Amino acid sequence: AAFALPAFASFEKDVITPAALEAVLNRKAPLSNIMMENDAIVNVIANVKTVISNPVLEEALLKTNHGVNGIPCGESCVWIPCITSAIGCSCKSKVCYRNSLDN
């Protein structure tokens, strides 16, 4: 993960993947049919995190740390805490991870 982390620092904002964003939205309002609520949440998150699609980065993080930090949640936490904490993720080494032993 050491080679991937400096790339995070080059962004002006932390990053989050669409999959992580969707997981947070489903956790916050799993039965909500009101798209406006989700749109508002997405707009707030987009102001503090850059939404990126980069499964290669997630795979690289998982392979390089050999699961020591847990499962990558698809979000960085260089400047802003993990939004994915709503789904059990926490910040370790500037990347949000979920404990691999948690269900």
Curated annotation (Swiss-Prot):
Cross-link entry Cyclopeptide (Gly-Asn), positions: G70-N99
Keywords: Disulfide bond, Knottin, Plant defense, Signal
PTM comment text: This is a cyclic peptide.
Maturation-removed propeptide residues: 10-69, 100-103
Signal peptide start and end residues: 1-9
Cystine pairs: C73-C89, C77-C91, C82-C96
GO BP: any one term: defense response
PROSITE patterns per UniProt: CYCLOTIDE, CYCLOTIDE_BRACELET
Function (record text): Probably participates in a plant defense mechanism.
Family: Belongs to the cyclotide family. Bracelet subfamily.
Protein name, entry field: Cyclotide vitri-A
Organism: Viola biflora (Yellow wood violet)
